[in-house]
């Protein structure tokens, strides 16, 4: 019987809990509902709890309250993805409940599990049952009930695990998509692994590592290194050019399609947004003067910007020769207002930068940046205001969490995809207040539909679509709408579901594995099937996704 848990014993529980999750991270990844090659739940939870474990191992204490503060801080700063943030919040509440204690008894152990659940539910904007939250809630309730019958912490932990497993097995009955795919909730499974490890540590057992101990620094740097090997002379259009034109009554009448067609002859990476009075343009060109002259045919030039991208690239290379990592350069750049974009792929990162993003944090579907990654960039920028573009639904919670931990006034634009991030950033006005930019950038998301093409990593059936491993999949927002072993059939099937008579602009962002012949064929198909839709092409260089699309 174990009636008390002190700091040393709690440290053993944490270490074994982290080890058990690490050993089972691949299993947890495999339970992801959608068969996209992200596998992020197990990875994110593993990185999160490993961050907490490392803090504990470096700051051991006999006091469980002090150790809990250390563990909570490590989890909070290391949290990655929604599952990692929820895990950090569960133990934030747990540790807050014991912060003044040197040791705890069975009843306090149980009440701490419940305190963690209360904290996590408050942290999630729209809690969904059938997830890690449900498993945590049912396990905590079981712990409280068992602690009324016994003073043995081991018995409480055993009962907590048993009920957590029952709850996990019931998740398909609460969440239809789990039942359709035939899996239990991945986050709930990850939490069960942690609790099972807790019991091993509590009873003095050691879980052997199945693989080398995770080195978070090496993994993060390896996954986050997005800087390409492009040569300066390979930059075809060297001037990032932007202008804002106020239409004049005595000037040329504005027709958007004609304007786009004419502007596209000046270069690439063209973006055009207009309302009744103003048109805003972004283009990479060799002749910025000609762009401005053309703009003057329509009215008065309000704002102009030209940046020499070749010179910028030479400066990056110069700094790299001084052994400055690209991420470190981004972090150390100081600005009044930091615009932080989470990005994947050289082309996409360059596009965000050319549009006004001051800092790029590499990351995306396969590697979500941690709360600490985002906090570091904001703090080291020494900004007064910050705008975060997560550009992925799984990075939203860590972005929100980071916003609460910094002194700068910080807002998070709820961008769930790269195309939505681009649309939001295009609405940024440096002369407007943070509140106005937040409003305008968020509103811009309503007019953009996002799509993507990737490949399936397993056989499954979801959203009524039969999917075979290795097939291409077309996703509209996060819903799978088509799957086929023919890439072109998949892409056109997706676009048919996204385009309609109201569609005006289709933006195609080609990934690092995109096929040039298919890309050319795709543009021809769109121009034939949807002649009124203007097509814009960008080389994003993103991994995982052959294509990203936006429809406006």
Swiss-Prot record:
Alphabetized Gene3D superfamilies for the sequence: 1.25.40.340
Pfam family name, one: FakA-like_M
UniProt xrefs under SMART domains: Dak1_2 (SM01121), Dak2 (SM01120)
GO biological process: glycerol metabolic process
Domain of life: Bacteria
DhaL domain ranges (all copies): 8-200
Single annotated GO MF: glycerone kinase activity
Protein name as annotated: Uncharacterized protein SH1689
């Amino acid at each position: 019987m174990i009636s008390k848990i002190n700091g040393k014993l709690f440290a053993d529980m944490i270490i074994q809990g982290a080890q058990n999750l690490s050993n089972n991270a691949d299993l947890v990844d495999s339970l992801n509902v959608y068969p996209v090659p992200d596998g992020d739940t197990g990875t994110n939870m593993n990185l999160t709890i490993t961050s907490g474990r490392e803090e504990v191992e470096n700051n051991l204490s006999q006091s469980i309250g002090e150790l809990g503060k250390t563990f909570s801080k490590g989890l909070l700063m290391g949290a990655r993805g929604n599952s990692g943030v929820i895990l950090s919040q569960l133990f934030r509440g747990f540790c807050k409940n014991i912060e003044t204690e040197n040791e705890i008894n069975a009843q306090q152990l149980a009440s701490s599990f419940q305190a963690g659940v209360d904290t996590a539910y408050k942290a999630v904007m729209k809690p969904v049952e059938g997830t890690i939250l449900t498993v945590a809630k049912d396990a905590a309730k079981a712990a409280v009930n068992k602690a009324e019958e016994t003073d043995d912490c081991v018995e409480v932990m055993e009962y907590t695990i048993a009920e957590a497993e029952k709850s996990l097995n019931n998740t398909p009955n609460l969440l239809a998509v789990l039942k359709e795919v035939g899996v239990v909730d991945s986050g709930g499974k990850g939490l069960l692994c942690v609790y099972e490890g807790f019991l091993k540590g509590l009873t003095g057992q050691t879980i052997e590592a199945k693989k080398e101990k995770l080195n978070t620094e090496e993994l993060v740097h390896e996954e986050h290194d997005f800087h390409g090997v492009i040569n300066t002379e390979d930059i075809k259009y060297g001037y990032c050019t932007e202008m804002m034109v106020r239409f004049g009554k005595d000037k040329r009448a504005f027709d958007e399609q004609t304007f786009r067609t004419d502007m596209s002859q000046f270069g690439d990476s063209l973006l055009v947004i207009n309302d009744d009075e103003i048109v805003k343009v972004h283009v990479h060109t060799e002749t910025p003067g000609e762009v401005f002259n053309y703009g003057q045919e329509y009215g008065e030039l309000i704002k102009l910007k030209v940046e020499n991208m070749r010179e910028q690239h030479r400066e990056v290379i110069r700094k790299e020769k001084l052994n400055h990592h690209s991420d470190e350069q981004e972090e150390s750049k100081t600005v009044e207002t930091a615009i932080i974009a989470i990005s994947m792929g050289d082309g996409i990162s360059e596009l965000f930068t050319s549009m006004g993003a001051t800092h790029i944090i590499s990351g995306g579907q396969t590697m979500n940046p941690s709360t600490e990654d985002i906090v570091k960039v904001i703090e080291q920028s020494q900004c007064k205001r910050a705008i975060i573009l997560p550009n992925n639904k799984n990075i939203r919670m860590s972005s929100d969490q980071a916003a609460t931990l910094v002194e700068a006034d910080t807002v998070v634009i709820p961008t769930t995809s790269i195309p939505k991030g681009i649309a939001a950033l295009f609405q940024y006005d440096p002369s407007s207040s943070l509140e106005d930019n937040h409003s305008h950038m968020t509103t811009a998301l309503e007019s953009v539909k996002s799509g993507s093409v990737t490949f399936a990593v397993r056989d499954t059936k979801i959203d009524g679509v039969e999917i075979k491993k290795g097939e291409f999949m077309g996703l509209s927002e996060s819903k799978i709408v088509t799957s086929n072993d023919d890439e072109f059939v998949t892409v056109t099937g997706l676009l048919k579901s996204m385009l309609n008579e109201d569609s005006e602009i289709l933006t195609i962002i080609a990934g690092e594995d995109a096929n040039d012949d298919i890309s050319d064929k795709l543009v021809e198909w769109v121009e034939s099937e949807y002649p009124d839709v203007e097509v814009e092409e960008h080389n994003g260089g993103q991994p995982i996704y052959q294509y990203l699309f936006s429809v406006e």
